[in-house]
Amino acid sequence: MINVGLLFGSKSVEHEISIITAHQVLSFVDKNKYNIIPIYITKDGKWLTGKILEDLENFKNLERLEKKSKQISSISAKDGKLILHSNIKKITIDVCLLTFHGSNGEDGSIQGMLEFLNVPYTGCGMYSSMYTMDKVITKLILKEKNIPVVDFLYTNKKNYTNDFLNHCKEVLEYPMIVKPARLGSSIGVKKVNDKCELEEAIETAFSFDDKVIVEKWIDSRELNCAVMGYKNIVVSEIEEIKKQKDFFDYNEKYVQKGKKFSNHIIPAPIDENLKNTIKSIARDTFNALECHGNIRIDFLLSKDNKIYVNEVNSIPGALSYYLWQMSGFTFSQVIDNMISIAFEAFKDKKSKIYSIDTNLFDLKVEK
């Protein structure tokens, strides 16, 4: 049986969403194939494990949860396996299944640690996770590859001045959408119609991230699809999100009906040509950002039927199982595929050369 470390939580404003995704995995994973070891990272960075983490109800009382959990005191690795030390107990992990959302988990930070420790993990690699987490880097790469994105500008807290507000008006025109550059779940996102609203929205976005992207707002439909694979890529069915406002916000996604997927129309009511175009752009996006694993790509469809890549999620909420279900995959099969891809990518990584058989300090230097 394969020991799977299910990592979730972490220091992120999307912390609770990560917990939900992890427990969806716990509900549907094939326990005849995998021994699931939950590893919860608290908001202040503690690493916890234990059976108590397997019941979502226990997360209502975090103080009790921490007391009843086993704190991981140290982490090491040997022979491609992650080793966790908790009191006197040692836990060995064969592969890590990542269900983080947002900063300090989905952004390449945990992936970088696992790369350094030489341990297989699900989802995109370190660099790809970093690219896709940053909306600015994502759009710059896609633009370079001639993949359609809406017009945008960006700034950071260090260099931000009033001139940026004027530049936005000249280049983008109102209305615009303001977003923290490295955040998901529509947190901190605002539509603005004038300079005063723009300035206020940028300040709000800066409270979540020190980098902000401002995009031209277009009246559009929101379409999504998932892409999964490594060397062979498969694209899921396409969905349409029926939004109640100008964009599908955090409240709709997780607090109101959005959490029950009542706003999701699968398959999306679009013609076959448009469907094929979106799937083709999805494949190109997956490759341009050097992704592997299971991602979700969000699109905008304008009134004149132009398609734009809006955002890329390297660890989508609920692992986009609802999209894969409509494409003939069970949630359990999605998890199987993600773990298989993790091992395949790890095998390729092991073939790389990381050192040269030369001792520079032992070389004789002619005088």
From Swiss-Prot:
Cofactor binding remark: Binds 2 magnesium or manganese ions per subunit.
Any coiled-coil regions, as ranges: none
Reactions listed under catalytic activity: 2 D-alanine + ATP = D-alanyl-D-alanine + ADP + phosphate + H(+)
Any one Gene Ontology cellular component term annotated for this protein: cytosol
Swiss-Prot/TrEMBL GO biological process terms: cell wall organization; peptidoglycan biosynthetic process; regulation of cell shape
Enzyme Commission number, as recorded: 6.3.2.4
GO MF term (any one): metal ion binding
Binding site for Mg(2+) 2: E311, N313
Primary localization class, coarse: cytoplasm
Binding of Mg(2+) 1, residues: D298, E311
ATP-grasp domain ranges (all copies): 139-340
Record key words, sorted: ATP-binding, Cell shape, Cell wall biogenesis/degradation, Cytoplasm, Ligase, Magnesium, Manganese, Metal-binding, Nucleotide-binding, Peptidoglycan synthesis
Location of the protein in the cell: Cytoplasm
Family named by the database record: Belongs to the D-alanine--D-alanine ligase family.
Protein's job: Cell wall formation.
Protein's recorded name: D-alanine--D-alanine ligase
Gene it is expressed from: ddl
